[in-house]
């Protein structure tokens, strides 16, 4: 099998990637936090930089349901941010699950749910700003937060475009929690999805440029958040977003997201456990063999982040026949288990 070399490209500047606790209680009366999910490190490095610049704690969505909430019932709302990658032009399954079942644990008890939207309201909710298609940021304005209302932002990482992901996220927060999203951004990062024909990791020159541009944009985003700018929609939605998110995405979920297709080549695998440590959902275990190294086994709780594939130092992991001969990528400075 032809294998491309394992590459760790230079990450963000040295100021980025400072370690932050996954769950850190804030002593400020205005509760602030950034919820994030990351597979290969693209979203994590963005979330860490925003947390450092904004002095906010990070909360990992993949494991936050196991940690006690730390939002006091009478706390004033501050900044609530979300950083995660776009998977198949939508939210990763783990993010959808968090928003539906666990985000409420972090909300003040006085937070009420929004009433169900009328048909006309639903139509407006599914509309995107006309600037979205051309990737031109809409005008932003400064706003002083009212008591109890958080400033909510979404920063998406993606290899190219987002499809209707911002709309799906916006509607979920509005319908379940009555929260309004004040600002949206998308940040292009090196491509990691390689599980279908024609998809591979970016060339090194392309990946380096994306990382450099992403570092600059992340700093700009932090400044906009510090000013509490609202009405921001700086997102590359891409062409045919409805087709991608509403037709292609269900097909991806039905036929291209099963962990049953993962396989480890026993002639190459050394049982080093890097795949186990890299899985954000603890979905991989090692199965012992007689007279052979233990090999990974995948459970059913998979969000198709491909961290296991990209983290294997021996390129022993494949997903069906679609990943044969393709490259690997993981953000430099992100350790196994981060």
Q: Which stretches of residues belong to each language-model region?
A:
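FMN-binding flavodoxin-like domain, especially the glycine-rich phosphate-binding loop
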Residues: 27-34, 40-45, 53-64, 77-84, ...
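A short, aliphatic-rich alpha-helical micro-motif
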Residues: 73-75
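A mid-sequence, solvent-exposed acidic-amphipathic segment
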Residues: 239-277
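Iron-sulfur cluster-binding cysteine motifs and their immediate structural context
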Residues: 264, 274-297, 303, 307-325
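Active-site-proximal loop/hinge segments that shape catalytic or ion-binding/gating pockets
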Residues: 329-337
